[in-house]
Amino acid sequence: MNTTVTYTFGSKVAEAAPVRTAVPDPLLFASVDGLAASLSNSECVFQPRGTGDTHVMTHHVLQALDKCREFRSLEEHAARIAAMTPGLDASPAGIRRVLDNLVARGLLVSNEDFVARMRVAGGLGAADGDGDSSLRAICIRACDRPAQLARLLASLAEYERVFRMTRPYVLIDDSTLAAAADRNLDLLREFARSTGCKVTYVGTTQQQQVVQRLAKTLPSSTDALSRLLLRPRGSAAGAFGGGRAWNLALLMSAGGSLVLLDDDLCLPLRRPDDAESGIDPDPSSVPGTSFYRSMDEALNSAAAIEDDPFALHLGAVGKTLGRLVAEPAFAIDPARLRGLNLGRLEHLRGDARIIGTVQGTCGSSRTESGAWLYQLDPESREAFWKDRESYLRNIEATSIRYGRRKAHVRAISNFTPFAIDNSRLLPCTNPVGRGEDSLFSVLASICRPESLLLELPVAIGHIQESDRKRSLRTTSAPPPRFNYFLGDYIQRQIPEILAENPADRLQTLAVGLRDVAGASESRRIRLLREYLAYARAEAIERLQQQYESAPNAPIYWQADVRSIIEANGRALTTNAPPRLADWPEDGDEASCARRLGEDTAHMAEALEAWPSLWERARQLGERFIGTD
């Protein structure tokens, strides 16, 4: 442990604390996050997070340090401290000397040092994974939509014609109609004939064979395997199960990387004209949204990229953030740190690893509700409500372009990753229900806390199979789905997990979920009511903030915002059973408690079994993908 001497205002700095020479004002500085404890009425001890150092200082100095959380020049910090610290008796020069001393101690970090340390921590000489060379397959999730699959395969055939990569493709077919499954298989075979690519079809029969193969070596995981990968017997044809194909794709690519596509997507990727190079470090920045009159106009709203779209994404996954920001295309401009709180940039660690890439959408929104349209950034919001005619079209989000202008990194995303680094253990997701992508992201942040997702300033085409009235779901304000509840519960209620090994972390998380499943019926009911009250209150607060921030908004937008607030308010005050959106509408309190117990127990069982399943799949390697 390294202990440093006391810092005070209005006194000479001790000889043992060498002061850094005057720093040019263009540099920006922010204070590190840490823990403090009082020693006396005048002194305290401060320990930065992640170090064993302790620093003794006066309470006035600690207050000054607390006022330097955002990246600003030392002159700006000095002026702010003088204006906002009551009882401070120090000259500007004295304040500046203390700030210089804090810089020397490493308690104030410059923007340039922050970025430089990121590159060093990323290990510029270390060997990162090469997502492109370790690609196991481009996995396509398909169901009863042959027309959508035909469009996607046509765009992939054009990609292969241009780039001649003959990449491997796997079609994971969840179709319930025999005719649709047969048509999907025919389309895949025709794609293979026209491109020369290796293809693998994984339909119901092949999925059962995978379960049987893994169950032979891991018999204790048979029940979990069936739930993770197979459609439940007697389930409705329309029961959504995107997580089943997701889990199968993760097993098929264990030890390598994969690309995950849905059958209603299509190439090429498009980059907006105002896209910028580099990474935006602001954690509060949000993607922008543009609105168009038709699907065709939205699909062609930006120029197609000239690069290999898969190489673009695969070239990033598996790298540390430090290695990534050393590349000009992903550099972080230190000047863009101005005004950002250093404590909110903890995810920007040089040794953090990119486990997946995310991109925007042109065409239809990939959400089932339009609630997000009432949380747009000011520029997008102006386009959203431009006039009543376009507004009535825009609320359905059927012809939009959504995405970023500049790359961005984050720990959790609500959208399906495009490329995934699966060279090290990643978690499964819930095999049933919507929101499986968001839940996977939360689980990955627990399993691999050093991981990040990279959002790229490109968009992929999305053409839904039929028109959706998202506005009806928006204004009715339905309850959240189970996967969103589970993700929120894990982030807010599960205690910090200290284990380093990803498999151990999943086991610990499973214990927390079994704790929910084992709670009394009354406690589970109370848990659901508390969560629904929180979700409703948060939605109301955010909408109120939007409403109050736009006093001159069109009356039709204001009316809809009030309507959504009122719908959430009615749901907040009602005494109805605490139902989540995936559960039967006629269920009573007891049935809701029972479903919560069953669903959390099943997810716990899946997390317990998953590490062994993933490792066995990794050992099988190419033989796993070749299952027929």
Tell where the protein language model's regions lie, with residue ranges.
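Terminal low-complexity segments of carbohydrate-biosynthetic enzymes
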Residues: 1-20, 60, 66-67, 71-72, ...
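Long, charge-rich, low-complexity alpha-helical segments
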Residues: 2-9, 42, 50-132
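Long, low-complexity, charged/polar intrinsically disordered regions in eukaryotic proteins
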Residues: 2-52
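Short, acidic, metal-binding catalytic loop of nucleotide-sugar glycosyltransferases
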Residues: 154-166, 190-194
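Active-site-proximal specificity loops/subdomain of glycosyltransferases
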Residues: 180-256, 272-273
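Short beta-strand-to-loop acidic/aromatic patch adjacent to the donor-nucleotide binding site
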Residues: 256-268
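Conserved donor-nucleotide/metal-binding helix-loop-beta segment in metal-dependent transferases, i.e.
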Residues: 267-348
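Acidic donor-binding loop at a coil-to-helix junction in glycosyltransferase catalytic cores
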Residues: 434-439
